[in-house]
Amino acid sequence: HILPGSANLIGGRGVTVKNLQRNTINSMKFPDAPHSLKMACGENPKRVYGNRQQAPSTRMGNAAGYRKSWIQAEAYLSRLNEYEAKSDEAKELAYKPQRDLEMDTLAGVLRGDILVHNHCYRAEEMATMINIAKEFDYKITAFHHGVEAYKIADLLAENNICGALWADWWGFKHEAYDMVQANIAIVDQALGGKGCAIVHSDDAIGIQHLNQEASKALAAGLRAGFDITKARAMNWITSNPAKAAGIYNQTGS
């Protein structure tokens, strides 16, 4: 699954592809897979734009930026729905809303057609993003990186949100310090095993060794006292990623 960037509050659409030899990129797209939307919170947006003396430059500014965009998207979708509800005769006399590609994507999220994948590290910010999602009635499919996901594992499970997490990578920036090696296992075992944990990597080498990454996460969970089978851990690199990509009806089991 390919996602665009993590420096913008709302980065753009993602796509699921098959690693097959094809003559065009479009022909590599996984059939009938939904698009996704990459969002990012925390240090990345506020650092990139703050260094340019632009907003957002704070975490509070990040939250304000999301809410402003979703308010615009709600208004855009309302205009579209109002126009589409008219009869063909009325449409000929009515003003057709001007198309906006950014708003098209956000409207797709509000309709439930596009899956939200959210780059986020800190527990309180993931909770903030969940609150914003509830305010504007959209669904977060997965938080990515989430080194503090273990702190809110039950909250993620309650809201049916997956955690796409590293097995043992942290400490490379301030918001990535408060990590535990049992992070994936804790998310998996939330609410009596109702959590959705994913072993992920955005590293070109690490992504080739997800089985080994899953083994490390499983070992950490066992050391922490969780009774997790190897079969259960396989879900972290098979069925759970397929669910998060919206293709579980075709692959992943």
Positions of PLM-derived features:
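Polyanionic/metal-chelating signatures
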Residues: 1-142, 248
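His/Asp/Glu-enriched, well-ordered alpha-helical/loop segment
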Residues: 115, 154-157, 161-253
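Short acidic loop-to-helix transition motifs that present clustered carboxylates
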Residues: 123-125, 146-151, 239-242
